[in-house]
UniProtKB/Swiss-Prot annotation:
Induction text: Expression is repressed by the transcriptional regulator XynR.
This protein's GO CC annotations: cytosol
One Pfam family this sequence matches: rve
Protein name, per record: Uncharacterized protein YagA
One GO MF term: nucleic acid binding
Upper lineage: Bacteria, Pseudomonadati, Pseudomonadota, Gammaproteobacteria, Enterobacterales
Every Integrase catalytic domain range: 137-303
SUPFAM superfamilies associated with the record: Homeodomain-like, Ribonuclease H-like
GO term, biological process aspect, one: DNA integration
Chain segments annotated as coiled-coil in the UniProt record: none
Length: 384
């Protein structure tokens, strides 16, 4: 199998860390992961062994001096806290403590860390936040991915439209990409890269705006592309952003830790900042909803691999099959009906209903519309 994601100097450490976190989980298919990451099994097992023996330090090209020192003074601890705060100034005491421990440092109790940070002005300012609500999550990775654009903002090269994609179960960030627009073609290009790296989810949810949805309920070309890949598509309820609450929380962290008060000269600087923070978020930053584990420790790439190839729809015997023409229309018993531009060139199946002259319109395994020949009408949409 051709290598999909060869390692290079720019992101070697983050890829090694992703690999060992995924490969260390129960039931992991290590050889399949090696193919996904573009490395040989021998290399994969080498990094797994180093990870088991030395932790994060074992993934470095050069071994680092261990940080373990059981008898550190208050000044030593404070110096560590200052260093961690300089790197992650928006993190509180709980995240800082866990992060330093993950780096190999022996830390005192949480109360001591909190008091030291408060004494030296290292705690982030309190923010009003959003009232806590009941939290729901899927029971395994890749059952549901949440996708959205974070509000666009100016930078030295124009405007940035950050595309974000989050796994519901693990909170793992699958994509944080600088985009210059919000067109379907731009989203598909980014999603292909994500699918090649992490496989296909069972379902994806988005809001109702362009390019993934339509406020009128009409099917979009992006929805059809995802459904053709076997991905079920859902949408958040209008005016209910909490439906995508995990992604909204991710956006607030992105704003606070990366964007707030910053100016980026060009797209390269901007994407490097996104890539760095995504690595920190996935592999270093403790997550309170995960009992202070990092998202990368809870995520596993999907077993459903992306090939780019799709099979045409097949319909049961007795189902009337019609092809939608280039203008988005189909003909049923001499009646011309508009199925919509998204279905141009597609073969749809018509299942006769009990009421004479009425048909359900199906595309693959999804009901996409209803036809009433008596009224010479067709209704295409998600509520059919």
């Amino acid at each position: 199998m051709e290598s999909l994601m060869p390692w290079d100097a720019r992101d070697t450490m983050s890829l090694r860390t992703e690999f060992v976190l995924f490969a260390s989980q129960d039931g992991a298919n290590i050889r399949s992961l090696c193919r996904r990451f573009g490395i040989s099994p021998a290399t994969g097992y080498k990094w797994l062994q180093r990870w088991a023996q030395e932790g994060a330090a074992g993934l470095q090209d050069r071994p680092r001096i261990p940080h373990h020192s059981p008898n550190r003074s208050s000044d030593d601890i404070t110096a560590l806290l200052r260093m961690a705060h300089d790197r992650h100034e928006r993190w509180g005491a709980r995240k800082i403590k866990r992060w330093l421990e993950d780096q190999g440092h022996t830390m005192p109790a949480f109360s001591t860390v909190h008091n030291l940070m408060a004494r030296h002005g290292l705690l982030p300012g309190a923010s009003p936040g959003i009232p806590a609500t009941g939290r729901f999550e899927h029971d395994a990775p890749n059952r549901l991915w949440q996708m959205d654009f974070k509000g666009h903002f100016p930078f030295g090269g124009g405007r940035c439209h950050p595309l974000t994609l989050l796994d519901d179960h693990s909170r793992f960030s699958l994509c944080l990409a600088h985009c210059t627009d919000e067109r379907r073609e731009t989203v598909q290009q980014q999603l292909v890269s994500v699918f090649e790296r992490y496989g296909l989810p069972d379902r994806m949810t988005m809001d109702n705006g362009s390019p993934w949805g339509d406020t009128t309920g009409t099917w979009t070309a992006l929805e059809l592309w995802l459904m053709r890949l076997g991905i079920r598509v859902g949408h958040s309820r209008p005016y209910h952003p909490q439906t995508q609450g995990k992604l909204e929380r991710f956006h607030r962290s992105l704003k606070a830790e990366v964007l707030q008060g910053k100016w980026f000269a060009d797209s390269g600087e901007l994407q490097r900042a996104f890539d760095h923070w995504r690595t920190v978020y996935n592999l270093e930053r403790p997550h309170e909803a995960l009992d202070m584990a990092v998202p990368g420790s809870r995520y596993q790439p999907s077993a459903r691999q992306y090939s780019g190839n799709t099979t045409p729809p097949e319909y049961d015997e007795g189902v009337m099959v019609r092809k939608v023409d280039i203008s988005g229309k189909l003909s049923v018993k001499g009646v011309s009906l508009s199925a919509g531009k998204a279905f141009r060139g597609e073969r749809v199946g018509l299942k006769e209903m009990q009421e004479d002259g009425s048909y359900e319109v199906w595309w693959y395994s999804t009901k996409v519309g209803v036809i009433d020949l008596k009224k010479k009408s067709i209704t295409m949409g998600k509520g059919c």
